[in-house]
A protein has these predicted regions:
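Rhodanese-like catalytic fold shared by cysteine-dependent sulfurtransferases
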Residues: 1-21, 28-71, 82-130
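Short, surface-exposed ligand- or partner-binding patches at beta-edge/loop junctions that are enriched
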Residues: 75
């Protein structure tokens, strides 16, 4: 089952459960230039320019999360790629999958800008830019 949590709820869970692993599934460019949560493991679900699913995604996650009962929190830009990545992990036997609603940047606002309506960064949670 895939659970949905707000960024704040996800942060709270990570503070309470040291087995929890946050996986940032965005591209290398997003991760480096837009910023990323401190402590997140970066494993892209899809990568530009062809936007094909990373065939090594599940294998790469297994390197960081051996316990399939540990909470695995997934984050993308706005919450869609992370759901797809969570489904792949669910098929691989992971039991505690958490999609972070609104991702890192949140939904588009009325001016088609991200970062003003929600997401990890908007919530004031720890993040850095490379």
């Amino acid at each position: 089952m895939i659970e949905n949590l707000t960024p704040q709820q996800a942060w709270d869970l990570m503070q309470q459960n040291t087995d929890a692993v946050l996986v940032d599934v965005r591209t290398k460019v997003e991760h480096a230039f837009v910023g990323h949560p401190i402590g997140a493991v970066h494993i892209a679900w899809k990568e530009a320019p062809d936007w094909q699913v990373n065939a090594q995604f599940v294998t790469d996650v297994k390197k960081h999360v051996q316990d399939r009962n540990a909470p695995v929190l997934l984050l993308c830009r706005s919450g869609q790629r992370s759901v797809d990545a969570a489904k792949a992990l669910e098929e691989a036997g992971y039991q505690r999958l958490i999609n972070i609603i609104d991702g890192f940047e949140g939904s588009l606002d009325s001016l088609n800008h991200r970062g003003n309506l929600g997401g990890w960064r908007f919530s004031g949670l720890p993040w850095v830019q490379s």
